[in-house]
């Protein structure tokens, strides 16, 4: 089952490479750095699945006062703002759905504000980070454990110099 984390927010700039998720209030205690997420969205009649990793978590006020004294006003009961958490997501992969097939595409269209964001785990985590491709090509070298408990892999082509230094 997909784990709902939050919503793509327009409180910060959204572009094809980076967006912010406004963390669901019931989920904020467990959102974590390096967590892999997925957002599904349409651009015209095209369907996309964007994957990314949370690289930063920040708290801010959701309200109209911006004097810098919200904390005192909130503690005195004067300010009715709501503290919110935003997770910065750096996009790792975008796939376009064509029929029943998902095809990697360049990052061209950002997810629109308001789209739901879900946690990625298991097989989906492998797709998000490219592990499924290197495992399929029999060039995956296990190298560690991700915060989710899943195995991380290195691509042997890079280690052996076929695709890298």
Regions inferred by a protein language model and the residue ranges of each:
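Basic- and hydrophobic-enriched, low-structure N-terminal and domain-boundary segments
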Residues: 1-164
């Amino acid at each position: 089952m997909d784990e709902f984390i939050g919503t793509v927010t327009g409180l910060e700039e959204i572009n094809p490479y980076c967006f912010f998720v406004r963390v669901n209030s019931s989920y904020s205690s467990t959102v974590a750095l390096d967590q892999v997420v997925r957002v599904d969205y349409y651009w015209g009649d095209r369907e996309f699945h964007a994957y990314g990793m949370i690289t930063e978590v920040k708290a801010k006020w959701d309200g109209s006062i911006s004097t810098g004294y919200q904390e005192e006003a909130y503690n005195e009961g004067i300010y009715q703002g709501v503290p919110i958490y935003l997770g910065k997501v750096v996009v790792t992969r975008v796939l376009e759905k064509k029929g029943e097939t998902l095809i990697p595409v360049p990052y061209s269209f950002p997810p629109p504000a308001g789209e739901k964001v879900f946690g990625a785990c298991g097989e989906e985590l492998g797709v998000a980070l490219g592990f499924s491709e290197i495992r399929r090509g029999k060039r995956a070298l296990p190298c560690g454990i991700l915060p989710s408990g899943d195995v991380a892999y290195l691509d042997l082509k890079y280690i052996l110099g076929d695709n890298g230094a």
